[in-house]
């Protein structure tokens, strides 16, 4: 997928999750 410029190591994807991004390998991907 496309990296969403947000990490999810300590907390889940927040703002980017609203854009359809999900956590994968500690990074939010679209």
From Swiss-Prot:
Keywords noted in UniProt: Cytolysis, Disulfide bond, Hemolysis, Knottin, Plant defense
Disulphide bond pairs: 4-21, 8-23, 13-28
InterPro entries documented for this protein: Cyclotide, Cyclotide_bracelet_CS, Cyclotide_sf
Record Pfam families: Cyclotide (PF03784)
Family of this protein: Belongs to the cyclotide family. Bracelet subfamily.
Protein name: Cycloviolacin-H4
Covalent cross-link Cyclopeptide (Gly-Asn) as placed by the record, residue numbers: 1-30
Record function comment: Probably participates in a plant defense mechanism. Has potent hemolytic activity.
Entry PTM: This is a cyclic peptide.
Organism: Viola hederacea
Record remark on domains: The presence of a 'disulfide through disulfide knot' structurally defines this protein as a knottin.
An example Gene Ontology biological process: defense response
Keyword match S-adenosyl-L-methionine: no
UniProt key word Disulfide bond: yes
């Amino acid at each position: 997928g496309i990296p969403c410029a947000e990490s999810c190591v300590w907390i889940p994807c927040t703002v980017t999750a609203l854009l359809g991004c999900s956590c994968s390998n500690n990074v939010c991907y679209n």
